[in-house]
Amino acid sequence: MEPRVGNKYRLGRKIGSGSFGEIYLGTHIQTNEEVAIKLENVKTKHPQLLYESKLYRILQGGTGVPNIKWFGVEGDYNTLVMDLLGPSLEDLFNFCSRKLSLKSVLMLADQMINRVEYFHSKSFLHRDLKPDNFLMGLGRRANQVHIIDFGLAKKYRDNTTHQHIPYRENKNLTGTARYASMNTHLGIEQSRRDDLESLGYILMYFLKGSLPWQGLKAGTKKQKYERISEKKVSTSIESLCRGYPSEFASYFHYCRSLRFDDKPDYGYLKRIFRDLFIREGFQFDYVFDWTILKYQQSQLTAPPSRGLVSPAVGTSAGLPPGLTSIDRYGGEEEGGRPPMDSSRRRMSGALENSGNLSSRGPMMPSSSLFAQSAGSSRRVTSEELQRCRTGAGLRNSPVVTTPEGKRSSSTRKHYDSAIKGIETLQVSDERFHHH
């Protein structure tokens, strides 16, 4: 008899693994809906899945938070059934030759700040923000950023009184060193400001292709963390952001100006990036760099007799081919955890397939189309972009022919409408069940 979970889901092939368990593809017995099923042995020394399921339950209903279908015990395993999601931003960053355009980064930044703000509104810090922990959705949620992996999350205030946790020092590094805030490296208890600083490092990583403290050599992990810390502390904000719009430096200056228990002005941070987006003349059309690469790739691989292949071909609109087989569960490069948390490893996020991205070889054809660095939507003709948007099921951006004074207002309205549309896209098919 085929293995079943919760008497509702058929357990399929393994699609990923983590330090404390494994992830399988599941199928709803009646509807054939595909889901991700996380399994953790009940005899594991430090169970993690129950803790994570409780956080998912607290966060349920939030935009960009995976829906939990079922949690319980099946035989020897704690079991969590959740939405199947698409590739991580790290996967897509790799697909785009490890550099993203300003337009793509700004479209992502708006959603990512929203995810962090929602997480904080529920009285929790994430404490391990990195590109691997943000996943795009599938199908009609293909352009929606999801936040995952709550294994290191910590409650920072009381739900009722909003009493903030006390300031402490001499804390061990918790999270991933590459994206950890300066205060985290200095041993200061994390608060909301630190999640936002980590997010800033992610954005610069996407723009620059790497961060100055990557690739440092050391004999031990502890020595490596120390070298990363030293390099990060000695790298000024101006140096880090040199050559990029001043808004990114403003973002870091704001984050580092916050006191330990300050509530960040998330609206201000979104606003400086939105104003930059509008000033650059971008359209909020959800045509990301990977959308364009996938479209170009489809033209190279399509038989001559066939018509244009839209970016919607594949598992979801705008997702690149080949990214349905990605293993995000490799080692923890530059990651650090406190001694008490050493067993709290994670199987972050649901994936569609397994397989190591780096071992797959080149994913894009070696064509002159890809000779330029991946990124700018301006490198594709307006006609191609029109086909791209139409094929992906995206509404065309309005053609702005108004005078300069009215253009900003028109673009801002379109921007606000677009982001509101993706942020309110919510479908809850089932209620959370715990057995």
UniProtKB/Swiss-Prot annotation:
UniProt-listed Enzyme Commission number(s): 2.7.11.1
A GO CC term assigned to this protein in UniProt: cytoplasm
Record Gene3D superfamilies: Transferase(Phosphotransferase) domain 1 (1.10.510.10)
Domain of life the protein comes from: Eukaryota
Domain Protein kinase: residue ranges: 9-278
Region (Disordered): 313-363, 394-414
GO molecular function, a single term: ATP binding
SMART domains xref list: S_TKc
PROSITE patterns: PROTEIN_KINASE_ATP, PROTEIN_KINASE_DOM, PROTEIN_KINASE_ST
Catalytic activity: L-seryl-[protein] + ATP = O-phospho-L-seryl-[protein] + ADP + H(+); L-threonyl-[protein] + ATP = O-phospho-L-threonyl-[protein] + ADP + H(+)
InterPro entries assigned: CK1_Ser-Thr_kinase, Kinase-like_dom_sf, Prot_kinase_dom, Protein_kinase_ATP_BS, Ser/Thr_kinase_AS
PTM entry text: Autophosphorylated.
Sorted UniProt keywords: ATP-binding, Cytoplasm, Kinase, Nucleotide-binding, Serine/threonine-protein kinase, Transferase
Catalytic site positions: 128
List of residues binding ATP: 15-23, 38
Places the protein is found: Cytoplasm
Chain's role: Casein kinases are operationally defined by their preferential utilization of acidic proteins such as caseins as substrates. It can phosphorylate a large number of proteins.
Summary of subunit composition and partner proteins: Monomer.
Family that this chain belongs to: Belongs to the protein kinase superfamily. CK1 Ser/Thr protein kinase family. Casein kinase I subfamily.
Name used for this protein in its record: Casein kinase 1-like protein 12
Organism: Arabidopsis thaliana
